[in-house]
Regions:
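Long, charged/polar, surface-exposed segments that mediate recognition or autoinhibition
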Residues: 83-147
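N-terminal secretory signal peptides that target proteins for export/translocation
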Residues: 1-6
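N-terminal leader/targeting segments
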Residues: 27-94, 98-99
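Glycine-rich, aromatic-bearing surface loops/beta-hairpins
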Residues: 137-185
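N-terminal signal peptide c-region/cleavage motif recognized by signal peptidases
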Residues: 21-23
Length: 185
């Protein structure tokens, strides 16, 4: 599975976190990892369900160029992104979903971008609570992209964390999961 280069995400996340006006507040006090697990990991990416959920919540749309900078797939056939939280006492959060074809398989992705959170703690939660198995790493000048595999019901799902090389506890983290599209009845 081919993922997008790190450079676009490295550029757009700081822009998004510094320029966006306050948006609809998230209505829970869950940790960033719990939010990623609830919205992306627990049931896998669900593009249509997530789009409907975001519309119901009336989340503000994320700019298309920023959304594309967060999408982990090359050449998505559909994508949407929203500002879930910014301002107030909670850190910035964005949610992005996409669909694409990889070979002959239809896949979906779900990503969340956070600012002002602990990157090391986020990674620890992923490996300990979801038994994510490390499968590779790519490092740039200031950021690292770590790849993991989660096996669920006999299917492998790819998880990617985009983290700072030198975390300080108030970090920008982008977490993504890519899985084969599940057809809901």
């Amino acid at each position: 599975m081919r993922l997008r280069p790190m450079t676009s995400m490295m550029f757009w996340l700081p822009v998004a976190t510094s320029l966006l006006a306050p948006a609809a507040m998230a209505d829970d006090t869950s940790s960033p990892f719990d939010l990623f697990a609830e919205r992306c990991l627990d049931q896998g990416p669900r593009y249509d369900r997530t789009v409907a959920f975001a519309k119901e919540r009336e989340w503000a749309a994320l700019a298309e160029d920023i959304t594309l900078g967060i999408v982990p797939l090359n050449e998505p056939t559909a994508f949407d992104g929203w500002i879930v939280q910014t301002g107030g006492d909670k850190p910035f959060e964005a949610l992005v979903v996409a669909k694409a074809s990889v070979g002959k398989k239809a896949v979906e992705s779900c990503s969340m971008a956070f600012a002002g959170i602990g990157a090391e703690q986020f990674e620890l939660f992923l490996t300990t609570t979801r038994h994510a198995i490390p499968s590779g790493q790519q490092s740039g000048a200031v950021r690292s992209r770590k790849f993991f595999t989660i096996v669920r019901d006999g299917s492998k799902e790819a998880v990617t964390l985009d983290l700072p090389l030198y975390p300080n506890g108030a970090d920008e983290v982008v977490a993504s999961i890519v899985a084969e599209q599940q057809i809901e009845n």
